[in-house]
């Protein structure tokens, strides 16, 4: 350490040659939001000096050819599992888009396999050209109102904190447990605070009083604000605002209305859950930066939000800027307005050029057998899919909202025959099913959903946040049963069924969440799924599978379905499908 420090100081003092010198660039100063011509001097993967051109010498020189030299981007909150590829493949996709650090919460795979799932993600994230700051999930399961594949106790959380690869405590979704001072939750928070770890937020729908208590618990950031008012409420309380733009949840447009040059230093960008095809086609955090620039945000401010702000939020003192003492994670950007990224450097090494990774990645870590055999369920029968209702009363329905993971709780009259709900294509009232798939419990929840617009068939997936049971939506029971059976046969993934026949399936053999294939193979499989969904009459401008995957998450308002039944998030309790007379008064 001393020798390394002395060498760094000798180079910084211009008494020794550096490892690398980047010349002919315009350095992006994210501290003062300006640019200047200068050289970047690098030793041992760290920036040791910025200088006027020609001041320093190095063993190797790289000519930036007039490009802007900016700090690399940080994704402040992501579930790698939602990309549907393993961490090694995920890195191949996001690094060429300028992202060299992610704050990852593996609670998807933890809900399937507990500590074993977290440890797999830690192992799979080592030795790749992407810094993965792994959080330990705080809410596995998210609530006691669903059956997950595993639990993470306070004792297990505390034990995981002993692993130096664990960065902090993942998003606290069970906010009622915080407000009621549930002792299990208190133990997890205390363990994080005693270790000096970051605690991530998930304060969906919190009012001002609840938000006060939530912040007082030491939760310093939140990605669940969905309106300008909610954004300001978090900023007023000193929280960092994480501006989310993923595949299902698209909050960027609403939240940026609350951002000004005066408060932008407390805002940063996150993807949360983003499918592989969108990561490939439009990008990761670079997509946020482009969108910000397109709506008139100063490009330097947008870059600052994606780098320095994120680094400061997560106390990453050596990341987020082009300055002495900072890690040499940087980008060459030809044009700021279009954010044309040509080169990505990680620890002073060029790892990507023109949208492609140019360094090899080690062989993929083999997942434990438990993750490869994660669909263990009892046979689902047609009788279990029956939903008893009275024909002369309204029913509680889940109304999806494209571009959001928040649903609306609505009441409508539905088609009923012989006391059983009949899906109606004309009314867009389809059957929603959540079937437990981890421990052969045989529990099945059945509800009614509006907004998918399917006219025939069924779709199903084992990606069902956060307990990741099987969730399916369809126009008839036969296709629903066939879709559920197909997922059991392929040990997890996505499937589309019509007239009892499987049109296409996308196997996700790692925990029913991620593929063991390369990202380009998975991209082609996704294209096949996208092409086949039209056969069911789907014409929506949203991703039906990702939207479906959030309909079983009982910590996101307003109403959801778990394997145990219909759940009213507002009252935080189960409700009957039927609307009774006393409810209408």
From Swiss-Prot:
The protein's Enzyme Commission number: 3.5.4.2
UniProt keyword annotation of Hydrolase present: yes
Known catalytic reactions: adenine + H2O + H(+) = hypoxanthine + NH4(+)
Database matches in InterPro entries: Adenine_deam (IPR006679), Adenine_deam_C (IPR026912), Amidohydro-rel (IPR006680), Metal-dep_hydrolase_composite (IPR011059), Metal_Hydrolase (IPR032466)
Domain of life of the source: Bacteria
GO molecular function list: adenine deaminase activity
Cofactor(s) in the UniProt record: Mn(2+)
GO terms (BP aspect): adenine catabolic process
CDD domains, A to Z: AdeC
Keywords: Hydrolase, Manganese
PANTHER family in the cross-refs: ADENINE DEAMINASE, N-ACETYLGLUCOSAMINE-6-PHOSPHATE DEACETYLASE
UniProt-recorded name of the protein: Adenine deaminase
Record organism: Halalkalibacterium halodurans (strain ATCC BAA-125 / DSM 18197 / FERM 7344 / JCM 9153 / C-125) (Bacillus halodurans)
Gene that this sequence comes from: ade
